[in-house]
Amino acid sequence: MDLDFRVLVVLLPVLLAGGWALKNILPAALRQVQSFFSK
């Protein structure tokens, strides 16, 4: 059980950082994709 807890403690900051990065990057990425397809 404590192995699962340690894995969660390790993954939680990674997931939070990934979610934060996606939240910041996604709008710009969507604009790039839209401009790519509108050519």
Swiss-Prot record:
User: Can you tell me which family this protein belongs to?
Assistant: Belongs to the PsbY family.
State the compartments where it is located: Cellular thylakoid membrane
Keyword Protein biosynthesis listed? The answer is: no
- Supply the Pfam families for this chain: PsbY (PF06298)
Per the record, the major location class is: membrane
Query: Any idea what job this protein has?
Result: Loosely associated component of the core of photosystem II (PSII), it is not always seen in crystals. PSII is a light-driven water plastoquinone oxidoreductase, using light energy to abstract electrons from H(2)O, generating a proton gradient subsequently used for ATP formation.
Q: Which gene encodes it?
A: psbY
Could you tell me which NCBIfam families the record lists for this protein? PRK13240.1
* GO CC terms: photosystem II; plasma membrane-derived thylakoid membrane
Q: Which GO terms describe its biological process?
A: photosynthesis
Q: How does it sit in the membrane?
A: Single-pass membrane protein
Q: What is this protein called?
A: Photosystem II reaction center protein Y
Q: How does it assemble?
A: PSII is composed of 1 copy each of membrane proteins PsbA, PsbB, PsbC, PsbD, PsbE, PsbF, PsbH, PsbI, PsbJ, PsbK, PsbL, PsbM, PsbT, PsbX, PsbY, PsbZ, Psb30/Ycf12, peripheral proteins PsbO, CyanoQ (PsbQ), PsbU, PsbV and a large number of cofactors. It forms dimeric complexes.
Instruction: Report keywords, A-Z.
Output: Membrane, Photosynthesis, Photosystem II, Thylakoid, Transmembrane, Transmembrane helix
